Structures are given as C-alpha cells and as structure tokens.
Amino acid sequence: MKQMNKLITGVVTLATVVTLSACQSSHNNTKLVSMKGDTITVSDFYNETKNTELAQKAMLSLVISRVFETQYANKVSDKEVEKAYKQTADQYGTSFKTVLAQSGLTPETYKKQIRLTKLVEYAVKEQAKNETISKKDYRQAYDAYTPTMTAEIMQFEKEEDAKAALEAVKAEGADFAAIAKEKTTAADKKTTYTFDSGETTLPAEVVRAASGLKEGNRSEIITALDPATSKRTYHIIKVTKKATKKADWKAYQKRLKDIIVTGKLKDPDFQNKVIAKALDKANVKIKDKAFANILAQFAKPNQKQPAQK
C-alpha cells in the first residue's frame, strides 16, 4: 500500500507510537505495567522510545497534523475524507482490511492520514496558484505540451490478454475500434477518450505514449502502474485525431497554468516549502532535545533546528 504510507514527503502514519501524543511531560509517573518488584511508567516508556526512528516520525506527523488542523481545519470536510476512504476501499475490495492491517493502520487512523494529506494538499495548491509564473516556466510547459487528441484505448488486467488483442489489431484490415470495444476489460467498457498531455485521470504512461504518437498510429503494449494499488495494467492505444499545435504559447496560457500548478503539487521540494511556511507561522519550538532534528528537512539553508530550553 505505497500510496497510503506515502502521504507527503517526511510524513508518516499517525498510528505509530500513539503514546507519545499523550505524554505531556517526561515526569509523568502514570503506571502502564506492573510486575513483581517493578513498574513501567509513562515516563519510562517515553524515555525508552523517544529516540527511535519510529518515534521521530510519529512526532513529526503529530506536529504537522496539529499545525495544519489549526490553520486549515475548515478547508477539508468529513465528507471528502469519507469519499477518499471509500474509493481506496473499493479499489482493494475484500482485501482492504488485510492491507490496512499490514500497513499498521485501522480505518480510523487511515482516515486521519487522508485528512492530513488533504489539508496539506489544500495548502500546497493555494500556494501554487498564488505563485508568480514566469514566461520561462510557461515556455517550458508549452514545449512539453501536446494539445487535444482523441484516441481509442484498450485496457487489460492481464498481459496475455493484451498480447492477444495486439495480435488481433495487427491483422490485415483489422478494425481497431471494434476490437477495442470487444476486448477491453475496462469496467465501464469505455474505449474512446479525448484529452491533452496534461490529463491526470488516465495513467501517466498512457498519456505520454499517446502524446508521442502521430495521428493514425498505434502503440505497442503500454504497461502502467497504479500508484494507489501498485497493480499493473496493460494498454494499447491508437490516436485517431490530433489538434495542430498553435505557435504562440499564450493561446494555451490558462491550460498551461493549470498544468504548472498540478506539477507543483507533485514536487516534494515545493511541498516542503509550504509545510515550512506553515510551521514558521505556527512558531513551532522543539522542547525536547530528542526531537531536535525532526523539522530539519523544512529548515531554510544553513538554518538549524535546536531544541528550545
């Protein structure tokens, strides 16, 4: 479950070392375990675990969660979280609970992950939209841009099915569109798509392949990896129509801006920049030396993150 545990750079599940969030002080003597001649207190447990990598990641996640809840709580609804949760659950089907457990998550802790991810995504998107985009950025985006194209796309879960379909469309006089409708294993049986190179609802591998094809040309088998489920799918593409690219990038300025903003959402450095800004606004101070370096990746160059006395 790569996507579930890879929310944003440096942020991990809130399910880990949950006790840390309850430790208000290293002097807390609440007993957790008793035995003959000894007890283990919250303080004992805290001091034993706080220097571990797991504890460092848990504290980082807790800090970022608290900061973004304070600054953006009303920007993400419970309905959005539930919708995202259901989408992932549907993708995994009956194995969802097992995959959650293997990732060290419960339904509730995974929903917390989703919420944190969406809070950060909102902040990143707002920052990206407000950034000044230079002419150089627009020209670079324009150079990589392929305008609207229409393509027949077959999708398969099994590579052998894709190979059989490829042989069928290679036959003399083969009708690609008819074969696509007959053989695709896409759930909705859809085969005709119109999109540009900034499309995000189709697999990135498919969009890249289609962008590189000339009108009337067909691809070989394209393998795509679903980042949400880590499953491979196989595709065969035939581009049936391609719009002529206009010479002036300004003709696509609005669309290019959308593509540039979307690119920033996937940029770890930009994400860290936004997180750093939120942490700075919250005036976060690390009080325990054990956690002195947890915010290092968000510090400005040559800026250290010492523990506060």
UniProtKB/Swiss-Prot annotation:
Plays a major role in protein secretion by helping the post-translocational extracellular folding of several secreted proteins. This is Foldase protein PrsA 2. GO terms for cellular component: plasma membrane. A lipid is attached at C23 (N-palmitoyl cysteine). It is a lipid-anchor. The keyword Isomerase applies. Residues 146-241 form the PpiC domain. Gene3D superfamilies: 3.10.50.40, Porin chaperone SurA, peptide-binding domain. A lipid is attached at C23 (S-diacylglycerol cysteine). It is found in: Cell membrane. One of its GO terms (biological process) is protein folding. Keywords: Cell membrane, Isomerase, Lipoprotein, Membrane, Palmitate, Rotamase, Signal. It comes from Streptococcus pyogenes serotype M1. GO terms for molecular function: peptidyl-prolyl cis-trans isomerase activity. The gene is prsA2. Its EC number is 5.2.1.8. Residues 1-22 form the signal peptide. Its main location: membrane.
